[in-house]
């Protein structure tokens, strides 16, 4: 077992004692004992931050085990008994200057270490404590004796065990003691003392090795900062460690520690005893959790290692398979080579057989010839020598053939060597290719992750934008509701105070005749006012002429009136003008009248120059044109003097056509015969002026009202009929829209005339609307989705099926979108049926 990290820190609230001052004593605890005495930890709540207050253990003396050399069978049994349970030792107060390798070697001097665990902090720095697991309890006892309070650098090492480990050590020592009691009574105290001497001798030997190890690390321990161990120094330490390992290890007598019963036997307060028990239980639980977490991490590491080994084995099997294939290929090559060798050997055998046959034949020939002449002996001897020479030549040829064969064999061996090199190179290339593929896959994964993060970011931006839009829409809707409530309140008050007799003439119109009669009355009143004003002006002119000393003011006024009438009369043409001259003249008049129209304000409605009519002739009721307003005064006077207004285009007359006296009055006869021609001549320039600015101002200002011609007749009737038709059409459209249901069930159940839904209607009305709504909902154009919705509509699909398909893309906006689209479809089909649209 191991101690949790929180037991390695000083308790909060208790100040540290100065060096050299012993810690305070608590009731029920004896004073501190010399170093080397086995100790147990005191709980944190009663422990000072100075050297830890420890309780001395109760010595338990067991009987000696006898001479081991006289009982070899007993020696094996003793070795089995020494291998007790694994025990964990808490090592604390480790100096920062002491390297982890030094602590490992110190722990290894005391016995076989199964594991050494030292916690790393958040910064990666090793903590000042750790947990060492020994294979045998004997090693644990030796570590407690030799390493506790060992001076390392500026600190003393702290070595402890917990209560559970103490219980295991007590059990192990009890077994050892029982084995000692079961031995014969012939065992003497001298043997036990010799065994104690052996243990002390071994402890002294290990202690000397520890001192040598500390002297070896003295440069690091005395250095101002911790330095990492160099590679040569590690080799030197390992050599010295091997030297000390070669010494024989003597068995260690069990040294019992204090048990839980001993703690209960100590005189102390009840709450402190309970606190100690709780601290021990908490320590066990914490260590158990740490062990479970470490076990999980170890399992994960083993799984990863297992997968890595599986991949290595798979790669190794692949290499072995390729090697076996190459080996089989080489084996086939060797078999072929052996077959060729056997074939050559058979050829040689055949050659030798033929040679022997020839030799025998020659021998027979020689035998036959031997009985012939001696003269032939020489020839035979020469033949024989030639045969021997040929035989030697054949032998040399065979030797050369064998040499060539050996050369070919060496060449094949070199070829096999090159093949092996190629295989190794191919393996390296495959490994590099695997590494490249792995890096490529990792890069793709990173790119996918980056793309996902980018899409996520865009989606979040769009969602935030939509949220803001929804909030603004909610605010606008709330504002509209407030306005409607305010308007309803105003209308309620208005209707409560409404009086039909008093307010109907103000808010309702009668027939056209009544309207024109009222306009005529107003016009007559305006004419009367104009006559009065003209008389006043004439009187003013006469007074001015008298003030200037004119002899005959009346004659002067008459002369001015005649001059104005003469200017109004058309000139007599000597010869007809050509069409080009007429066009030039018309363009000049247009240019002359354009500044007049440009000076008018945009809000003023265009009107034609009023026609000069004699006051004596009473106009008909229908003479009030649509352009005439009740506020427009008449321009005639009894004497024929016309007073121009600010809307009159005759204000732009040249200076020479005005009276010399400087008055802004225009004189003229009331019954001028050339007046209709002048009106006809000026109709076209005025229309052209308005047509010129109509296109430019159509986007910025409202369209100007169409001018009504002065010649009232069929045109007036048609205009009135057109106005009525427009009003009726607007009423039809409004009633049609009101008839279309707004609730989804009634809207989807509305019968739709699919025969009217054609490609022309789809392209002109439905598709642009769908595209605009998709851009509004998604934020970008989505041609595929638009085509899909249009195809579903052209396929006469039900609105619910289209809603189900579109809901996967538009989510909660899908229902609103389909409801609006279906209302548009119903409106277009119904409007086309009744002729509202073409």
Curated annotation (Swiss-Prot):
The modification N6-acetyllysine is found at residue 135. GO terms for molecular function: mRNA binding. Residues 284-639 are annotated as: Necessary for nuclear speckle localization. Residues 669-678 have a biased composition (Polar residues). Residues 1-30, 173-201, 220-242, 282-437, 493-683 are annotated as: Disordered. It comes from the Eukaryota. Keywords: Acetylation, Apoptosis, Cytoplasm, Isopeptide bond, mRNA processing, mRNA splicing, Nucleus, Phosphoprotein, RNA-binding, Ubl conjugation. Residues 745-838 form the PWI domain. CDD domains: RRM_RBM25. The keyword RNA-binding applies. Residues 87-164 form the RRM domain. Sumoylated. The keyword Metal-binding does not apply. Residues 282-428, 516-568, 585-594 have a biased composition (Basic and acidic residues). The modification Phosphoserine is found at residues 225, 228, 578, 672, 678, 698. Pfam families: PWI, RRM_1. This is RNA-binding protein 25. It comes from Mus musculus. The gene is Rbm25.
């Amino acid at each position: 077992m191991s101690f949790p990290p929180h037991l390695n820190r000083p308790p909060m609230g208790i100040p540290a004692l100065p060096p050299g001052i012993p810690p305070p004593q608590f009731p029920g605890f004896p004073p501190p004992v010399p170093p080397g005495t086995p100790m147990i930890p005191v709980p944190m709540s009663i422990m000072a931050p100075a050297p830890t207050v420890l309780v001395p253990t109760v010595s338990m003396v067991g009987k000696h085990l006898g001479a081991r050399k006289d009982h070899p069978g007993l020696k094996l049994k003793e070795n089995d008994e020494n291998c007790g349970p694994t025990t964990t030792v808490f090592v604390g107060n480790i100096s920062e200057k002491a390297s982890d390798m030094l602590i490992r070697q110190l722990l290894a001097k005391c016995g076989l270490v199964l594991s050494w665990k030292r916690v790393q902090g958040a910064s990666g720095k090793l903590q000042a404590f750790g947990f060492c697991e020994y294979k045998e309890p004997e090693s644990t006892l030796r570590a407690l004796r030799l390493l506790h309070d060992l001076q390392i650098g500026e600190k003393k090492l702290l070595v402890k065990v917990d209560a559970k480990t103490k219980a295991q050590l007590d059990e192990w020592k009890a077994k050892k003691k029982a084995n000692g009691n079961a031995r014969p009574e012939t065992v003497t105290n001298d043997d036990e003392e010799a065994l104690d001497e052996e243990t002390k001798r071994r402890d002294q030997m290990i202690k000397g090795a520890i001192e040598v190890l500390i002297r070896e690390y003295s440069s690091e321990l005395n250095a101002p900062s911790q330095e990492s161990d160099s590679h040569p120094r590690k080799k030197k330490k390992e050599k010295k460690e091997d030297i000390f390992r070669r010494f024989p290890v003597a068995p260690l007598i069990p040294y019992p520690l204090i048990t839980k019963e001993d703690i209960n036997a100590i005189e102390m307060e009840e709450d402190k005893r309970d606190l100690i028990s709780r601290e021990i239980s908490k320590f066990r639980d914490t260590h158990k959790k740490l062990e479970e977490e470490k076990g999980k991490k170890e399992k994960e590491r083993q799984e990863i290692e297992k997968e890595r080994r599986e991949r290595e084995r798979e790669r190794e099997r692949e290499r072995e398979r390729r090697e076996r294939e190459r080996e089989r290929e080489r084996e086939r090559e060797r078999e072929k080579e052996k077959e060729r060798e056997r074939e050559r050997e058979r050829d040689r055998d055949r050659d030798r057989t033929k040679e022997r046959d020839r030799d025998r034949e020659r021998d027979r020939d020689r035998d036959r010839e031997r009985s012939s002449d001696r003269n032939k002996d020489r020839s035979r001897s020469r033949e024989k020598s030639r045969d021997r020479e040929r035989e030697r030549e054949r032998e040399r040829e065979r030797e050369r053939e064998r040499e060539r064969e050996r050369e070919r064999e060496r060449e094949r061996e070199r070829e096999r060597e090159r093949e092996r090199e190629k295989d190794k190179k191919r393996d390296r290339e495959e490994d590099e290719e695997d590494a490249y593929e792995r890096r490529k896959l990792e890069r793709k994964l990173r790119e996918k992750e980056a793309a996902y993060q980018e899409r996520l970011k865009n989606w979040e931006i769009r969602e935030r934008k939509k949220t803001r839009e929804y909030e603004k829409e909610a605010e606008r809707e709330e504002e509209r509701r407030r306005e409607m409530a305010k308007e309803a309140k105003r209308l309620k008050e208005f209707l409560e105070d409404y009086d039909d007799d008093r307010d109907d003439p103000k808010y309702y119109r009668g027939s056209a005749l009544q309207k024109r009669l009222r306009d005529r009355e107003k016009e007559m009143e305006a004419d009367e006012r104009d006559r009065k004003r003209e008389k006043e002006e004439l009187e003013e002119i006469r007074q001015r002429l008298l003030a200037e000393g004119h002899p005959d003011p009346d004659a002067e006024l008459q002369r001015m009136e005649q001059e104005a009438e003469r200017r109004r009369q058309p000139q007599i043409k000597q010869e007809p003008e050509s069409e080009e001259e007429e066009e030039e003249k018309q363009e000049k008049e247009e240019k002359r009248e354009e500044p007049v129209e440009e000076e008018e304000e945009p809000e003023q409605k265009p009107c034609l120059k009023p026609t000069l009519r004699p006051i004596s002739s009473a106009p008909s009721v229908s003479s009030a044109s649509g352009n005439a307003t009740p506020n427009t005064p008449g321009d005639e006077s009894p004497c024929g003097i016309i007073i121009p207004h600010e809307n009159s285009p005759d204000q732009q007359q040249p200076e020479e056509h005005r009276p010399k006296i400087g008055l802004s009055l225009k004189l003229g006869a009331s019954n001028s015969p050339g007046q209709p021609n002048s009106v006809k001549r000026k109709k076209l320039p005025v229309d052209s002026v308005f047509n010129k600015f109509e296109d430019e101002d159509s986007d910025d200002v409202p369209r100007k009202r169409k001018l009504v011609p002065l010649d009232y007749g069929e045109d007036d009737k048609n205009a009135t009929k057109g106005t009525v038709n427009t009003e009726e059409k607007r009423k039809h459209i409004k009633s049609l829209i009101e008839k279309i249901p707004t609730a989804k069930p009634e809207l989807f159940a509305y019968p739709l005339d699919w025969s009217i839904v054609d490609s022309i209607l789809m392209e002109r009305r439905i598709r642009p609307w769908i595209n605009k709504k998709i851009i509004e909902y998604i934020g970008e154009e989505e041609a595929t989705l638009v085509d899909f919705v249009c195809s579903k509509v052209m396929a006469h699909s039900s609105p619910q099926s289209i809603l189900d398909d579109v809901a996967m893309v538009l989510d909660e906006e899908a229902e609103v979108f389909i409801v609006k689209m279906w209302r548009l479809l119903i409106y277009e089909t119904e409007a086309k049926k009744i002729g509202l649209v073409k």
